[in-house]
A protein has these predicted regions:
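Short, Gly/Pro- and small/polar-rich lid/capping loops
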Residues: 1-37, 44-46
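A short glycine/serine-rich beta->alpha loop
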Residues: 90-94, 127-135
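Glycine-rich, flexible beta-strand/loop modules in the N-terminal catalytic cores of phosphate-handling
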Residues: 33-35, 40-119
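Glycine- and Gly-Pro-enriched alpha-helical subdomains that act as flexible
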Residues: 135-151
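Short, conserved phosphate-binding/catalytic loop or strand-edge motifs used
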Residues: 121-127
Length: 151
């Protein structure tokens, strides 16, 4: 059975992936916490060729005040890919994909943050994708979790 033009080749003849890893080899991971001095918590992660920076700010007052919840705090997450993070420059405006990933990350992190201890406040989590190379969603969630733990 030969390789068709429509087939995706994941391994070369020697069993090496296109990114240079062997079949059972995982991506290199590097995590640093506390990298932003003006944030309450922050993290920098390199996950393979992905480079991600996350910052946590808060709890702080909600603006405008009418959005405040009297029973619990609010968690806001923003996942943003820099225009230079991918090989073909992307539009800097938030894409539908970025908005959806922001919501997914918020839903994943919300149970871990004790928002009931911070009524009428907001905790902002900003995630910047500096370089993307597959798996940036998972790495972004990891960066946000480390930044929250650092806060």
């Amino acid at each position: 059975m030969g390789v068709k033009k429509t087939d995706i080749v994941l391994l070369d003849d020697k069993g090496i992936r296109c990114d240079g890893r062997k079949i059972g080899e995982t991506r290199r991971i590097m995590i640093k916490a506390g990298v932003l001095k003006n944030a309450n918590g922050s993290a920098y992660i390199e996950f393979g060729e992905n480079k991600i920076l996350a910052g946590v700010f808060g709890p702080r007052d909600v603006h405008p005040k009418h959005l405040a919840n009297t029973d619990r705090g609010i968690l806001r997450c923003r996942y943003h890919m820099q225009p230079y993070s991918v090989s073909e420059r992307k539009n800097p405006a938030p894409s539908r994909r970025e908005i959806e990933i922001s919501k997914v990350i918020k839903e994943a992190l919300e149970p871990a943050v004790m928002l009931e201890n911070f009524p009428r406040t907001v905790v902002d989590v900003f995630i910047e994708i500096l370089q993307a190379d597959g798996g940036s969603r998972c790495a972004a969630l990891d960066a946000a979790a480390v930044a929250l733990a650092d806060a």
